[in-house]
């Protein structure tokens, strides 16, 4: 009887671990509204772009159309190419709320991203040469979000209680500014506002690859 109870408990624990793994492996989703001082054009899209070391967009990862000023982004589980990864060092981190002394535990290579609005000029449902890219200000309540890929588990800590753990694969971090600064790793987040600002001066062809 005791052996049976032990087996049942073991099965429950294993099942919980499996479901937890599946939940974390689910595609990440970000949804919210688009804000602009001007009327939004019908062919406006919201995209997630990989960034180079300087923080400039380098290649589109995912995008969403804008309907009634709303969008929903879904990020695939596909890993970025090796040449899109950069060693995780302090100088590479420009996350909201990351201030003061930064402490990184573990060694990892990451791929950073940025969210931008753009005009899909040829209506091909993706960013291509000739499309107009806009500077965009992304907020979530009193903070913002970070979308980052890591090839290993690592931890980033800083002043005011900033504490973020990156797991292998894609990470969606929701950051709430304050004292302390709260960081949560989540699978989805709603209510993310993308404010469309001025046009960027990049050459569009630069954004088509690493």
Label every model-predicted segment.
Residues 2-11:
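Bacterial N-terminal signal peptides that target proteins for export
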Residues 28-38:
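A short, amphipathic beta-strand motif
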Residues 32, 55, 62-79:
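Glycine-centered loop-to-beta-strand initiation motif
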Residues 37-54:
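Short, ordered, surface-exposed loop/turn motifs in non-cytosolic proteins
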Residues 74-88, 149-151:
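Short Pro-Gly-centered beta-turn/loop motif in secreted/extracellular proteins
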Residues 120-132:
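Acidic, glycine-anchored loop motifs typical of Ca2+
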């Amino acid at each position: 009887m005791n052996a049976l109870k032990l087996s049942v408990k073991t099965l429950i624990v294993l099942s919980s671990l499996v479901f937890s793994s599946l939940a974390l492996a689910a595609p990440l989703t970000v949804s919210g509204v688009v804000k602009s001082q001007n009327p939004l054009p019908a062919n406006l899209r919201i995209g997630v772009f990989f960034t180079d070391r300087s923080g400039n967009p380098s290649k589109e990862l995912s995008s969403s159309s804008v309907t009634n000023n709303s969008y929903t982004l879904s990020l695939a589980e596909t890993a970025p190419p090796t040449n899109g990864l950069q060693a995780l060092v302090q100088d590479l981190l420009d996350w909201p709320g990351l201030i003061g002394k930064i402490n990184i535990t573990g060694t990892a290579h990451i791929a950073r991203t940025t969210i931008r609005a753009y005009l899909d000029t040829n209506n091909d449902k993706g960013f291509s040469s000739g499309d107009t890219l806009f500077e965009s200000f992304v907020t979530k309540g009193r903070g913002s979000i970070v979308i980052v890929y890591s090839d290993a588990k690592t931890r980033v800590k800083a002043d005011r209680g900033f504490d973020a753990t990156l797991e292998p694969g894609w990470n969606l971090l929701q950051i709430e500014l304050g004292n302390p600064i709260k960081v949560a790793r989540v699978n989805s987040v709603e209510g993310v506002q993308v404010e469309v600002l001025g046009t960027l001066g990049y050459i569009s062809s630069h954004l088509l690859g690493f």
